[in-house]
Amino acid sequence: MCGIITVFGEERDVPTDLLSHRGPDDYRTETMGKCRMDFYRLAINDLSAAGMQPFVRLNRMFMCNGEIYDHRSFRSGDERSKSDCEVVMNLVHTIGIENTVKSINGDFAMVYTDGKRVLAARDPVGVRPLFYTRYAKDSIAFASEAKALVFLGTRIEIFPPGHFYDSYVNTFICYHTGYWNVHKFSGTKNHERIRHILEDAVHIRLDNTDREIGFLLSGGLDSSLIAAIAARKIGRIRTFSIGLEGSPDLEAARKVATYLATDHTEVTFTVDEGLRALRQVVWSLESYDTTTVRASTPMWLLCKYIKENTDCRYIFSGEGSDEILGGYLYFHNAPNVDEFACENMRRLHLIHQFDGLRADRCAGAHGLDLIVPFLDKNFIQCCMEMNQTLKMTKLEKEVLREAFKGYLPDEVLWRQKDGMSDAVGTGWVGALKEHAEKMMSDRMFEITQGMCKHNTPLTKEEAYYRELFWVCYDARNDHLISEIWRPKWTTVTDPSARLLIEKNPK
């Protein structure tokens, strides 16, 4: 988790400290020809000065915010560091950008230049963030977060996942289409294969850091499985959970921690602490989406605690499973397998705007590197090629639960899906709605609705988050969230998992 800024074309003065929260360990700026690169380092792999970026070699310069998990297989012996990212510069130079991004297994947002031409690329599902803006003729800028491009004063856009950019043709080119073919579902249920691929995804990530490792543990299926796999591999691990006093997540996480014999830390927060953090959370997220803000606030507070009280900087989390396996409760309402499959792919396609965004920004706000094994490209491929009818089960993600029998206590392994904003404590979502009612008069709500041509808020809570977003980024950036996250095939518009259960009990 680092911060990168690139300005290519007309020269511009780039303010410093724009992304120091993402990369608090070091900062460097380099210029080659028409290209300037600014790098904010969070040292994870090769902590020495040799691992500092941008990497500059004769007539080429490169930087990458990311992790390349199979970097050892690409080493030529000419590298000057042990950094997992340095090998990518040599690959781009020898085999080209398209062949490089198709070959590597990693989470990345990268930029390469020879001073006359700039190339940029983002991983297939957008685990690592990247934005761009065209600020002048034949000029383009890239950055890890939208806030780092605001100074240029031009429209900011999301760099599309699974694409690379080439200034020679001045366009974005899709290099990855493997997950998006609705007719490409012929696989069978194979518990051993699912287990092996996910375990491998965790193991290669455990082996890719020189920093102390931690695990976010909500007590739900996904984060608990990641912790269980890691504990079997490396022994005693360090886990962290957060919730309001007496919350379901804290209780469930405690059971998992005891079962796995982890070094466990519980962090409690109050409603007032959460409400006070909202403006900072929205600034960090660059989002006004309701479920994202609700779930991000406790996660943001937990990451803040980890940064301030531990040496853990390489943090595992469980995002991605619901998007890959159709794990959200509203998927039970899918009328047929075709619609289930299409919505499954749509959720994965948009993860970089919702759960993926939450994971990256909450950790990045506090200089932590968040690792998401469920979004390993091999695991995604395995699950998306599966016969989709195998995902349409009475209890969500049964195929995953069955593959990992014995890894967790049964009451956790077979625990029903609960949204993070619900499970951190029954009072949290209610308190947010009540707070929004106090902050937004009926007239103010009406005015805000009228100002929102895109993603018009349906509730005062949604309008309140939009107002907080405007304080940080103004209405010109509303388009950075393509839609508000809402369940499908139901009259419920609130994203709360508990409301879905109450409205559509099994």
Which ranges hold each PLM region?
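ATP-dependent adenylate-handling active sites, centered on carboxylate activation for C-N bond formation
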Residues: F8-E10, K116-L119, P124-L130, R134-A136, ...
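Short, hydrophobic secondary-structure boundary micro-motifs
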Residues: R28-T29, F215, M392, W414-Q416
